[in-house]
Amino acid sequence: MSKFTWKELIQLGSPSKAYESSLACIAHIDMNAFFAQVEQMRCGLSKEDPVVCVQWNSIIAVSYAARKYGISRMDTIQEALKKCSNLIPIHTAVFKKGEDFWQYHDGCGSWVQDPAKQISVEDHKVSLEPYRRESRKALKIFKSACDLVERASIDEVFLDLGRICFNMLMFDNEYELTGDLKLKDALSNIREAFIGGNYDINSHLPLIPEKIKSLKFEGDVFNPEGRDLITDWDDVILALGSQVCKGIRDSIKDILGYTTSCGLSSTKNVCKLASNYKKPDAQTIVKNDCLLDFLDCGKFEITSFWTLGGVLGKELIDVLDLPHENSIKHIRETWPDNAGQLKEFLDAKVKQSDYDRSTSNIDPLKTADLAEKLFKLSRGRYGLPLSSRPVVKSMMSNKNLRGKSCNSIVDCISWLEVFCAELTSRIQDLEQEYNKIVIPRTVSISLKTKSYEVYRKSGPVAYKGINFQSHELLKVGIKFVTDLDIKGKNKSYYPLTKLSMTITNFDIIDLQKTVVDMFGNQVHTFKSSAGKEDEEKTTSSKADEKTPKLECCKYQVTFTDQKALQEHADYHLALKLSEGLNGAEESSKNLSFGEKRLLFSRKRPNSQHTATPQKKQVTSSKNILSFFTRKK
């Protein structure tokens, strides 16, 4: 029998549970030297051209062709030109002070001798929008191929391939293993058991059929010990996933022209290490039985893991007395049995009298979680879920000001125009990426004076409608800098050395929700017709007994399915919203008797001259849009 269970296999079909399975197939795809590739494509250059992307005097991206000359991001552009005489430097797009649009200035930059071709740091601000735009195009391709995509940064994503691999395994009838053997024939037994329900959820899967061992991996399988490539179902899933990733990466290359590097494994942390293992334009697969070989290959330490590369990772090296080499293996061998051993050691260290808690990044109340994380990370088994939801807490646009680039309130407003344009672009980026409406409700202005004093002012932003409006943001920003400008009478105020605008407190509205989802079930007018009276009645029809009947209280209309009832509920809610916008008629069933007397008392005829009022003709159309058209 396999060492994996039916439960672990079926978990792949759940986006929220797949990462917990030992059969999980997670990919990390990184676009190589992304900014440099974007500029290569924009300028019609080849992959062999040595291109660097420049921001003022600094290099922010180096193409792989330029790296052959020993150029890195640590070099200045002048140093890089000395290493490669035919280097092609390209400056990022920039905003100009007072303008709400960015543009390129090709052929201009700090490396050009002509003063007219210099890009002034004082009057310009870097724009990353061209790279965000290309990132959105790539993300669209990723999402069209995979149902769960997490955008890790502007140039990298995680993919959960669980559903794709599961469907290929169980339902793909066209996939060919060899010229005369299809996947469905090799997997006929497990497919029949699954479709027929002839299995116990906690029982082990059958052994893989001999024929499936001809399944090929796409990419480089990390296998220094020369183990058999396919021995169990986890290898089958990874092999299928590798072929899916190859297809996705080919689409990125064919459609956008960008090369990528990919890592595949059963966890996010390991596949991220794998994507960086071999670059550019490569794909590395780490099988479960090769995890320890991969982690101990000499290229990784505990600080190589995602979230442990900063001060926490460095502190852990000191606290756990880890060696600077083979630190991952050291954790496994020092605490071999369980995470509890590691927790006891951490607790003892934290309680030592010479341990400075004021500067520590280790929470003494969360050592159990940290120990569990380290224990599993060192074994390549620390699973994390993928999240496709936007987690937006704040956005900031700022400028470190030089010279007299912000010497008055007029200069402040000119920079705010740039900030608002940049923030608007980033909000639109989020809205397109997640198909949601994103509305910041709070804006904050922060500035640093000539004497390095910091002043801040924040407050709410009001919009006319539900969409974000840049001019409303600018209006509030101008008000705040004007209020702060009162302090500008002090000689130590201007010129400013820093100015920033931050937006927070986001409302995120899902565009895919229905009217009722958006406003909540405000009109609770529907109930099942089955009540106490029905319980006392008998019926001769068994079909009627089994069929639930749902009824509208206002019109006594009966529905036999929930969908029809919900559509009728939408109609009532739209009608009520329309009456709130355009006014109600006397015949409205949303008004009580008292409300009708209050609102329509002027229309009531006196008792001496009664007449039968003519009923207003009601159209048969109940299109929801008609309720939001103001009556003339």
Curated annotation (Swiss-Prot):
Zn(2+) binds at C552, C553, H568, H572. Residues 625-632 are annotated as: POL30-binding. The keyword NAD does not apply. Keywords: DNA damage, DNA repair, DNA replication, DNA synthesis, DNA-binding, DNA-directed DNA polymerase, Magnesium, Metal-binding, Mutator protein, Nucleotidyltransferase, Nucleus, Transferase, Zinc, Zinc-finger. GO terms for cellular component: mitochondrion; nucleus; replication fork; site of double-strand break. Residues 598-632 are annotated as: Disordered. Mg(2+) binds at D30, D155. Its main location: nucleus. It holds the Pfam family IMS_C. GO terms for biological process: chromosome segregation; DNA replication; error-free translesion synthesis; error-prone translesion synthesis; mitotic sister chromatid cohesion; response to radiation. Residues 607-626 have a biased composition (Polar residues). Belongs to the DNA polymerase type-Y family. This is DNA polymerase eta. The gene is RAD30.
